[in-house]
Amino acid sequence: MTQPTILITGANRGLGLKFTELYAQKKFNVLATCRAPQNAERLLQLAEQSDLISIYPLDVGINEEIEDLSHKIKDVPIDILINNAGIWRSSSLGSANKQAWLESFAINSIAPYEVIQTLLPNIKMGVLKKVVSITSKMGSIDDNTSGGSYIYRSSKSALNMVMRSLENDLRPYDIATLTLHPGWVQTDMGGMNALINDEQSVSGMIEVIDALNIKNSGRFIDYAGKHINW
């Protein structure tokens, strides 16, 4: 097998940066994407240390940038695609801003679909054929026992439904899908009071992704491999 290739969105910090680091250590060719590479100091440092990391500009909320990326990597097989880019907008009862809600749906729910759809020819060319979207247990309808966080919860619930549909539509191409909860992680989004660090989360998620195949495709699980109800 030739050296596998992985594409990661939101690779400039947090989980995306750690995915980039650890997959490069696993000898993957890493296509690391983010909105403003020129400002991504830690990602640029990783790329200087490894010739396996290539950086591409990508704002997942702008379709033209997704199309531009697809042209740049037109003939590159993608073995694993990780939709990691996402945003958090605070919202409680009485404070859910409509514009913030629409923005969250655009980035958290629609953009992963757009990225997958546009890069589908590359994924079909890959050997491993795995599509992963980083979601949250907060998007689980079954698990919602505390309310609040209307914007984030609903945007991730929508992403979960997108991934359920994609599981059916991509299966004929032998493309396996995974909807993955990273845990509560100490990142800019998760905060420093979170339960685990990025190394623990991403190392666990990589093990789960390693085990992904067409037979167990379509699951919603966490970084430790634990099943989550939709």
Residue ranges and their predicted role:
Residues 82, 115-119, 123, 162-163:
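Hydrophobic positions on the long internal alpha-helix
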Residues 87-105, 124-171:
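Catalytic loop of short-chain dehydrogenase/reductase
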Residues 47-64:
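Rossmann-fold cofactor-recognition segment
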Residues 59-76:
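Conserved Rossmann-fold cofactor-binding substructure of NAD(P)-dependent oxidoreductases
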Residues 179-182, 191-230:
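C-terminal helical subdomain
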Residues 12, 16-21:
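N-terminal Rossmann NAD(P)H-binding glycine-rich loop of SDR-like oxidoreductase domains
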Residues 24-42:
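Conserved glycine-rich Rossmann-like NAD(P)H-binding loop of the short-chain dehydrogenase/reductase
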